A protein has these predicted regions:
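Accessory, non-ATPase domains that flank or precede helicase/AAA+ motor cores in DNA-metabolism machines
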Residues: 1-410, 417, 422-438, 471-472, ...
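A short linear hydrophobic-aromatic micro-motif
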Residues: 731-737
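Inter-lobe coupling/hinge segments of SF2-like helicase ATPases
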Residues: 248-253, 257-261, 269-714, 718, ...
Length: 791
C-alpha cells in the first residue's frame, strides 16, 4: 500500500542457504493468513537466535582520524565537542576508543563504551552529535554493514607476515609498544596466530599501524559450531533420568503392534493424521520410537513435539538411547549457540530427528516423514504471546504440506481432535490397556463436606491415613495441588481488605521462601506490610493454600518423610513466573526415580509424562477452584489434568491408588475420573458444547484490547465489535465487548470481543474488519484465532 509504506532500495543480498525452504515458506504464509499475523513476525518466531541477518551501523576511523588519535597535539584540526563552541584536540576519547577497537565500533555500543571515560560523549544523544561533527571533519566515516548472522560465528586473529617480505626495521625506533606487540604475535604458532581479543586494549591499538606496515595480517575465522549439546542437550542429569542405553526394545503389546502396523503402512503414501489414544502407561512412546525408526530406515526425517521439553527429560533420554546422535533437541533452556548448532545440523542433514517444544514445529528437518505431537491436548501448545499459533495445528498442516504422517498422542485427547476423528479427518487408534500387567489405579473420591480436612485445612482423614500407610510401606506418594506459593490471599481480619497487585486486578500471593508478596501475572514483588494498608491495624492474615504451604505442612505432619516440591518456583522460575529450567528440576526427577523422595508435592509439572515406578499413591488436594473458572473448557481441563496425574500411580511393580478430595463429588469431571471414563465424559461434554455453540462445533476468534485508559479501551472495543458485525452480518455471532475476567494486568485495562461462526471465511473477514479500526493512543489490539483461554 503506497499510501502507508515507502519502499526502500535493496542494499545487499545475504549469501548462503535460505533459513526456510519453499515448503516451510508456504506453511508460514498459511499460518500468517490463518492467525492474522505479520509474516515477518511468524518467521522470526520460527528462527533460533543467531539465524537472522541484520544491518549494523558502523563508525570507522579514517586515515586522518587515526593520525589524530595517535598524535592529539600534532597540528590536527580542532572541532567543537560540546556543540556550543568549546574546542579540544581531535584526539578525544571517541577516536581513541575506535583506535583501540581496531578501527571500528558499532554505533549502538559507542555511548556505553564511553560511559566510563567521561566527557560530553557519554550519552547516546551526545555521542550521536559528536559522531556527526567528527564525520564532517573527515575523521570518521559511518556506514551500514550487512552481517549474516546465519553464517558461523567468527573470531579475529592476527598472524605475522612472512619474515622475508618485510622487516621490523620499518618501524620507527621509538615505536617500542608496536615492537612488543609484533614480538608477541610472532611468538604465536604460525598456523594459528593470536586471537585479537586476547590482546589488551593498548596492544590492540597498535594493530592498525602494524597491518599498514605489512608486518601482520588480521583475519576473521569461522568458529566451528560446537557439537556439545548434540549428545547432551537436555543436561547430564536429564539424560541420566531417562536414558536406558543398551536396553533392548520391549516386545509390543497387541494394541501397540496394531498401531505400529497401521502407521508404518501409511508412511510414504502421502499425508495422513492418526489420533493415538492410549491410557496412561499404555506405551505410546514405544509406538513413536518404532514408527520413527522405520521412517529413518527409509531415509525420512522425524519431528517430535512435546508440551514443554524441560518437563520431559525422560522422553529425550529414551530417544537418545534408541537413536544416539541422530537426535537434535531444540530446547529453550539451551545456550543460544547450542540451539543454533542443533538447528544447523538438522538443516545440513547431519541429524534426522528433532525433538522440541512448540516452536520446534519450524525445525528444518529434511525429507520429513513422520511428525509426532505428544500430549496433543496440552494447552501449552498454544502460543499466548506474539503470534498466537497452535503448535499442534501447525504440525498437522506441516505434515499435510510435506506429504508426511502426523501422530497425535494423548490419554485424554482434546475434544477438537476427538471430533476430527469422528468426522474421519483423523484415523483413530486405541491403546486401551497399560503396557505392563498393572491396570489403571482405582480412584477414590473423598467428599470434604462429610470428611472435612484437619485443622490445617490440608488432608482429610482418609488421605492422611493413606499417606501414613504408604510411608510405612516404604512407597512413594505424589500430592497434587495446582497452585504455587504459600498463601493465595493476604486478608485483613479487621476491615476485610485483600492485598492486591497495584498493577493487576488480582490478589498477591505470599511466598514464604522469599518472604515476599508476588503477583503471578506481572511479577511485581512487595514486602509483607506489618499493618493493613487501609485500616492500619495489625490484623493481616495469610489464607488459602499453595504448594509451598502444603510442603511445609507435610513436613510438620510427617517429620521423618523425605519431602520435595516441584513447581515453577523450585524449577527456577523468575518473579513473573516464566521458568528458567535448570538443574533442580532434573535433580528432583533423578531423586524420585532413585527412591530418594518419599512425598513429592507439586503442581501440573508432576503430571507431564513422568514415569515414576515407585509411586503407589496420588492425592489430589483441591481441584474445585479449577472447575468453576469462567471458561467453557474448564471441565475438560480438570478431567484431563486429574486423569493425567492419576496415571502417575501404579506404573511399577506394585499397584497404585488415587484419592481425590473435593467439595463437588458430583461434578461431571470428578464422576468420570472415578472410573477413568473418558468416553462417557466426552459424549456428555460434546453434547453440551453442541447445544451452546462452542468449539469443536463452531470456530472462534477473540479480539483482545488493552491500554492504560479504561474508557478509551472500552470505546475502541465497541468500535471493533461494530466493525466486525458490519462485515460478518448474521453469519457471525458476537459476544461483548466486555471486560476480561481479569480486567487489569500490568496497569492496563483489558476488554474482549468474542466472534463465533460455523464458517471460517466470514469469521476471518469479521476479525480483520474489527482489528483494522483506528485505536486510541497506547491501545493495543491482538487477534487470537482459536483461543484456548478466556482469561
Amino acid at each position: 500500500n503506497g499510501t502507508r509504506f515507502k519502499p526502500r532500495d535493496i542494499e545487499a543480498v545475504v549469501p548462503g542457504t535460505p533459513a526456510f525452504d519453499e515448503q516451510m515458506m508456504g506453511l508460514a504464509r498459511w499460518a500468517a493468513d490463518y492467525y492474522q499475523a505479520p509474516l515477518g513476525e511468524l518467521l522470526r518466531a520460527g528462527l533460533p537466535q543467531g539465524e537472522r541477518a541484520e544491518a549494523v551501523r558502523q563508525v570507522r576511523l579514517t586515515a586522518a582520524g587515526e593520525r589524530a588519535a595517535r598524535d592529539p597535539g600534532g597540528g590536527s584540526p580542532q572541532i567543537a565537542l560540546d556543540g556550543v563552541g568549546a574546542s579540544a584536540p581531535v584526539g578525544d576519547p571517541l577516536l581513541r576508543l575506535l583506535l583501540e577497537a581496531g578501527g571500528e565500533v558499532p554505533w549502538r555500543l559507542i555511548a556505553r563504551r564511553l560511559a566510563g571515560r567521561g566527557g560530553p560523549t557519554a550519552t547516546a544523544a551526545a555521542a550521536a552529535a559528536h559522531i556527526g561533527r567528527l564525520e564532517a571533519a573527515g575523521l570518521v566515516e559511518v556506514g551500514d554493514e550487512v552481517r549474516d548472522r546465519r553464517a558461523p560465528p567468527t573470531r579475529r586473529f592476527v598472524a605475522a607476515a612472512a619474515s622475508d617480505v618485510v622487516s621490523a626495521a620499518v618501524l620507527p625506533a621509538r615505536a617500542r609498544a608496536r615492537r612488543a606487540v609484533l614480538e608477541k604475535v610472532r611468538a604465536a604458532p604460525a598456523d594459528e596466530g593470536l586471537a585479537v581479543d586476547a590482546l589488551t586494549a593498548s596492544e590492540r591499538a597498535q594493530l592498525r599501524a602494524l597491518t599498514n606496515a605489512g608486518l601482520v595480517r588480521v583475519e576473521q575465522r569461522p568458529i566451528p559450531l560446537s557439537k556439545a549439546g548434540a549428545d547432551d542437550q537436555v543436561g547430564a542429569p536429564a539424560a541420566r533420568v531417562g536414558a536406558k542405553a543398551g536396553e533392548c526394545p520391549p516386545t509390543p503389546t497387541a494394541g501397540q503392534a496394531h498401531a505400529i502396523r497401521e502407521i508404518i503402512d501409511a508412511l510414504g503414501k502421502g499425508y495422513a493424521t492418526f489420533l493415538l489414544q492410549g491410557v496412561t502407561g499404555s506405551g505410546k512412546t514405544e509406538v513413536y520410537l518404532r514408527v520413527i525408526a522405520e521412517a529413518r530406515a527409509a531415509g525420512r526425517g522425524a519431528l517430535v513435539l512435546v508440551p514443554e521439553i524441560a518437563l520431559t527429560p525422560q522422553l529425550a533420554g529414551r530417544f537418545r538411547a534408541r537413536f544416539g546422535d541422530d537426535v537434535a533437541v531444540l530446547h529453550s533452556a539451551l545456550p543460544p549457540r547450542e540451539r543454533l548448532a542443533a538447528w544447523r545440523r538438522l538443516r545440513l542433514g547431519e541429524v534426522g530427528i528433532a525433538l522440541g517444544a512448540r516452536s520446534a514445529v519450524f525445525a528444518p528437518v529434511r525429507e520429513l516423514g513422520v511428525l509426532v505431537v505428544d500430549e496433543e491436548h496440552d494447552p501449552s501448545f498454544k502460543q499466548e504471546e506474539g503470534v498466537r499459533y497452535h503448535g499442534r495445528d501447525m504440525a498437522v498442516m506441516r505434515a499435510q504440506r510435506a506429504g508426511a504422517v502426523a501422530v497425535l498422542g494423548s490419554a485424554t485427547p482434546s475434544l477438537e481432535s476427538r471430533r476430527n476423528a469422528e468426522l474421519g479427518r483423523f484415523r483413530h487408534l486405541l491403546l486401551p490397556e497399560r503396557a505392563t500387567p498393572r491396570t489403571l489405579p482405582p480412584v477414590e473420591i473423598v467428599d470434604l463436606r462429610r470428611h472435612p480436612p484437619g485443622p490445617d485445612g490440608l488432608l482429610s482423614t482418609p488421605l492422611a491415613e493413606a499417606v501414613a500407610a504408604n510411608l510405612a510401606a516404604g512407597q512413594q506418594t505424589i500430592l497434587f495441588l495446582n497452585r504455587r506459593g504459600f498463601s493465595t490471599v493476604v486478608l485483613c481480619r479487621a476491615c476485610g481488605l485483600v492485598v492486591r497487585c497495584a498493577h493487576c486486578a488480582v490478589s498477591m500471593t505470599y511466598h514464604r521462601g522469599r518472604d515476599r508478596l508476588v503477583c503471578h501475572y506481572c511479577g511485581t514483588q512487595e514486602s509483607v506490610p506489618a499493618l493493613c494498608p487501609a485500616c492500619r491495624l495489625p490484623k493481616l492474615e495469610r489464607l488459602g493454600m499453595g504448594t509451598e504451604r502444603v510442603e511445609a505442612l507435610i513436613r510438620e505432619q510427617f517429620p521423618d518423610a523425605r519431602v520435595a516440591r516441584l513447581d515453577r518456583d523450585t524449577a527456577g522460575a523468575s518473579a513473573a513466573g516464566a521458568p528458567e529450567r535448570g538443574g533442580h528440576l532434573n535433580e528432583v526427577l533423578r531423586a524420585m526415580n532413585a527412591g530418594e523422595i518419599d512425598i513429592l508435592v507439586g503442581t501440573q509439572m508432576v503430571t507431564k509424562g513422568h514415569d515414576f515406578g515407585g509411586v503407589t499413591l496420588v492425592g489430589v488436594l483441591q481441584p474445585d477452584q479449577a472447575m468453576h473458572l469462567p471458561d467453557f473448557r474448564a471441565s475438560e481441563r480438570v478431567f484431563q489434568l486429574l486423569e493425567q496425574v492419576a496415571g502417575r500411580a501404579g506404573r511399577g511393580d506394585r499397584p497404585g491408588r488415587v484419592i481425590v478430595q473435593t467439595y463437588n463429588p458430583e461434578h461431571p469431571a470428578i464422576v468420570a475420573v472415578r472410573t477413568h471414563d473418558y468416553e462417557g465424559f466426552v459424549r456428555a461434554e460434546l453434547e453440551a458444547r453442541a447445544e451452546l455453540g462452542y468449539p469443536p462445533f463452531t470456530r472462534m476468534v477473540v479480539l483482545r484490547l488493552d491500554g492504560p485508559d479504561e474508557a478509551r479501551v472500552r470505546a475502541d472495543a465497541r468500535a471493533a465489535a461494530d466493525a466486525a458485525v458490519s462485515v460478518g452480518g448474521t453469519r457471525v455471532r458476537l459476544r461483548g465487548p466486555a471486560e476480561a475476567p481479569i480486567p487489569r494486568v500490568r496497569g492496563r485495562s483489558r476488554f474482549q470481543v468474542w466472534l463465533a461462526s460455523v464458517e471460517r471465511a466470514p469469521l476471518a473477514a469479521a476479525a480483520r474488519a474489527g482489528s483494522a479500526v483506528k485505536l486510541g493512543p497506547d491501545v493495543r489490539l491482538v487477534v487470537d484465532v482459536d483461543p484456548q483461554s478466556t482469561l
